[in-house]
Structures are given as C-alpha cells and as structure tokens.
Design a protein with these regions (language model features):
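Histidine-centered, metal-coordinating catalytic motifs and their short helical/loop contexts
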Residues: 96-124
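Amphipathic alpha-helical interface segments
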Residues: 1-105, 127-144
C-alpha cells in the first residue's frame, strides 16, 4: 500500500473516530440533561453542548458515508466497492434500499438542520436514529 492510500484511510478513520466520540458523548450527556442544566436559568448550556455534539457526529459520519466527492468518503479509500457494500449490508442486516433510505435521512438532517438552516425541514423533519450510523461506522472501521 502506498503512502497516499494509507493517509487517505487514516483520514477516513479519523472521521469515524470523531463521529464515534461525539455521538457517544452526546448519549452520555443527553441522559442527564435535566440534572446538568438545573440552575442555569434560560441558558441550558449542556443542551447546547449536546446539540453541537450531534451536529458534529452527523457531519463526520457524512464525511465517510455522505457525498462521493469527499476525499474521506469510503469509495475514495476502499477499492472493492461491491465487496464493502456486501459486507456493510450483511453486518447491518439491511438491504441496499433500506440503507439508502437511512442515508437520505442522515444527509438531509446534516444539510437542512446542521450545515444550513432550512426552516421547513427544521419544523417538519426529525432527527434520525443514530444506531444505524454507529453500526455503519463500526463496520467501515472493521473493513478498512
């Protein structure tokens, strides 16, 4: 493996690590928000931290699974696309159609709520579940 390819894989792995750290920290804090934000008036500082963490998680997941144009996208660092897809869908126990539907929810969340403010999506959309993203990230990490 050449140095450039190794660096590309390392960059993608770094995105997966940041995703994992952010989403797990979010879950750890989200479970005790009422306690942490007690006595802070209208500031709700830990709720703000949680919002930043879930946004960071969505952004970093999308760096590996979002747009093919990203240098850190799995298609740019894994040569056997069909082999990875097969492995991913088997590990997640999902179909390509189901994963694409999830991918669409996650990328729309990132684009319409996190990266840009789309008022219509913000009021009508919902935050996607992150268990699938966690499993996909772990699968990509294992495969790389």
């Amino acid at each position: 493996m050449d140095v450039e390819k190794a660096q590309a894989i390392e960059n993608s792995m770094m995105c997966l690590t940041i995703f994992s750290r952010s989403i797990h920290t979010f879950f750890a804090l989200a479970n005790v928000l009422g306690h942490l934000d007690r006595g802070t008036g209208d500031l709700f500082p830990f709720r703000g931290v949680c919002n930043a963490l879930i946004g960071d998680a969505a952004i970093h997941w999308c760096k590996v699974f979002g747009s093919d144009a990203e240098a850190t996208h799995w298609k740019c660092v894994i040569d056997d696309h069909d082999g990875f897809r097969k492995f991913l869908f088997e590990e997640l126990r999902t179909t390509p159609t189901e994963f694409h539907a999830y991918w669409k929810k996650m990328t729309e969340f990132r684009s319409n709520v996190i990266a840009h403010f789309n008022a219509e999506h913000f009021s009508n959309g919902s935050t996607p579940e992150f268990d699938t993203a966690i499993a996909a990230a772990a699968t990509a990490h294992k495969y790389m």
